[in-house]
Curated annotation (Swiss-Prot):
SUPFAM superfamilies: Cysteine proteinases. GO terms for cellular component: plasma membrane. It comes from Pyrococcus horikoshii (strain ATCC 700860 / DSM 12428 / JCM 9974 / NBRC 100139 / OT-3). This is UPF0252 protein PH0672. It is a multi-pass membrane protein. Its main location: membrane. The chain crosses the membrane at residues 5-25, 106-126.
Amino acid sequence: MKKVSVIIFIVIMLGIGCLNLNESIKETCPRTSNITQAMSCYIPEDFEILKGVAEEIPGGTIEWKIWNILEWEEDHLSYDNNKGSDIILKPSEFIKVGEGVCTDYAVLTAGLLLASNISPVYLMIFHFMEDPTLHAAVAVNISGKLFILDQRLPPKNLDSYLIQFSKLEGKIILFAEMYKVEMKKGRVVVSGRKYLDLSNFGFYPGNISLDMLENLLLSEFQRRTNLFPRIDLKTVLPQGLKERKVWMIKFENFKLFYDDTFVEQYSNFIADEILKNEKIKSDISRYSAFWISIKLEGDDLIVRLFLGR
């Protein structure tokens, strides 16, 4: 049994000066460090560019579109730890230079969502205990549940997002400002600021249906490899086969971030990660049967791939 990869989901944090809410909003659309002004001015100005990018990002459902937007940002953008200005980049500028901070990501992400006809979205501004630096991200509401989109996969429900900072980053979020951002007759309207007290927010893991995830993963793996599924490979070398091999893949902190809302996307993600391993790919070409089992060990997801021939 061999461990072949470790996947850690961590949101990159902002640098000092990432967010400025104190600049007054003017009637024109100047360069600005005020994120609400940037949302309302930059997005309409760059909307055709945003629409062109959004049309290239696949997504037959809202879940797939959101997932693929974050994946696109991972592939094309990176965090700028040395940005010397708090002026927010226009989406077209951010796409061109490929580096930005949390406010740049938030404006671009909101723009891509709105250009994908996902509206409203929500601007989230997080305030931390004992840290004056603020952090901006975007959220969407799916079936009454708020998911935070923050630069990288996966989308996280609010519980998961809070525990990420407290457990993995050592930072406590005290409260958040929440603004509605929506398209109205070609304009981007930012409205409805409200405050969410998160200081005593309890952590409740996202919905986890291991059976559903395992079944989707089995189907996806069979589709990609054309291997024959054999459930008895879990325990024995089945009759008619001469060799059995087991691979183990660990996804760290999976329980903290997983939610069944994105079960289809997670099953595809796990299959992708397994098949990125060249040794596993080589084995698959030499074996004829497979099975996959998954289980949680603490917060980690353990995936076992059984191969037979």
